[in-house]
From Swiss-Prot:
Entry EC number(s): 5.1.3.42
Transmembrane feature ranges: none
GO molecular function, one term: glucose-6-phosphate isomerase activity
Annotated function: Involved in the synthesis of UDP-N-acetylgalactosamine (UDP-GalNAc). Catalyzes the conversion of glucosamine-6-phosphate (GlcN-6-P) to galactosamine-6-phosphate (GalN-6-P).
Protein family (similarity comment): Belongs to the PGI/PMI family.
Broadest EC class assigned to this enzyme: isomerase
Organism, scientific name: Sulfurisphaera tokodaii (strain DSM 16993 / JCM 10545 / NBRC 100140 / 7)
Catalytic activity: D-glucosamine 6-phosphate = D-galactosamine 6-phosphate
InterPro entries according to UniProt: Glu6P/Mann6P_isomerase_C, SIS_dom, SIS_dom_sf, SIS_PGI/PMI_1
GO BP field: carbohydrate derivative metabolic process; carbohydrate metabolic process
Protein name: D-glucosamine-6-phosphate 4-epimerase
Active site: E198 (proton acceptor), H214 (proton donor), R294 (proton acceptor)
Origin organism lineage: Archaea, Thermoproteota, Thermoprotei, Sulfolobales, Sulfolobaceae
Length: 311
């Protein structure tokens, strides 16, 4: 497999230069998505938006007439997101769809919803730069915020440094169970876990600081049949002290800018997972069980989705 993370700077740049539909004023924001299409909405929580923001990663959703819904499904056929969007449209007509096509684009067309198209032919987790860039552009227009979206590109220009760190991390992780901790960057700790799971087919977990200091930290006080490898994404002095106490590998954000750090840390997660996959001799792009559960999920919801589409 050609390493898709090597193309991220181009992906970010393309998303910056692509025209998107005009966005109406946003009073409340709801994000629908799951898996690789859901994690950009989770990472958006880091920004602490100036309006009520809710993330739903499943088929259950709560919206009202004030809600602007962003429904993201890379394939366009994510059952849970389709069901959640159809449920949302019973309460609000303010919705935006981000997809490469599929059933959700058909629904958007039927309901005259704006669509932002993603390129086809990639795994969902690899298109993060497109989705997240579009999200920032949407909130800048809909909320009147002024995030410098160009900082996403600037955050990954030091690719060689991130690549070097990823190699060190992967070599340290192999043979151990990584647990990634953070406070401010907790959503990126979750992304690290997901990337290692999907690309390397390897166990990984994450937890929140300082919450873990009051329970999970005791894992490191006694010998265990498992070899854990703690990693802390450091954002403050308490993160630093927590890392020192459990002898964790420390990841320091490279920048003062939150968008630069989101881009660089997310890229680091991807690079680390691919390096780990190479060490393990597994194919990052290959999925074995996920397609099976997608098919079973669709069969469970097929009748409800078809009924809602006909309303």
């Amino acid at each position: 497999m050609n390493n898709p993370y090597e193309n991220w700077i181009n992906f970010f740049q393309e998303a910056l230069n692509t025209n998107i539909p005009s966005i109406e004023k946003i009073e409340e924001l709801v994000y629908l998505g799951i898996g690789g299409s859901g994690i950009p909405g989770r990472i958006l929580e880091i920004l602490e938006l100036p309006v009520k923001y809710q993330l739903f990663r499943g088929y259950k959703v709560k919206v009202n007439e004030k809600s602007t819904v962003i429904a993201v499904s890379y394939s366009g056929n994510t059952t849970e997101t389709i069901f959640a969007l159809l449920t949302s449209l019973k309460k609000t007509r303010k919705a935006i769809v981000i997809t490469s096509g599929g059933k959700i684009e058909e629904i958007a067309s039927k309901h005259n919803l704006p669509v932002i198209k993603l390129p086809k032919g990639l795994q969902t987790r690899f298109v993060f730069p497109y989705i997240f860039t579009y999200l920032i552009r949407i909130i800048n227009e809909g909320l009147g915020t002024n995030y410098n979206v160009n900082e996403l590109v600037e955050g990954i220009k030091d690719y060689s440094k991130l690549n070097e760190i990823s190699g060190i991390l992967a070599s340290q992780i192999i043979g151990k169970i990584p647990i990634i901790y953070s406070s401010t960057f907790l959503p990126i700790a979750e992304r690290f876990k997901q990337e290692i799971n999907e690309n390397a087919k390897y166990p990984a977990f994450y937890n929140e600081l300082p919450e873990a200091n009051h329970n999970e930290i005791e894992l490191y006080s006694y010998p265990s049949p498992y070899t854990f490898y703690p990693i802390v994404i450091v954002s403050d002095k308490l993160d630093e002290e927590s890392a020192n106490l459990i002898n964790a590998y420390k990841i320091y954000p490279l920048y003062q800018s939150i968008l630069k750090n989101i881009a660089s840390l997310t890229l680091l997660a991807g690079l680390t997972s691919v390096k780990l996959a190479m060490l393990l001799g597994v194919k990052p792009e290959q999925l074995n069980i996920i397609p099976k559960i997608r098919e079973k999920t669709f069969k469970l919801f097929e009748g409800d989705i078809n009924a809602d589409q006909n309303l």
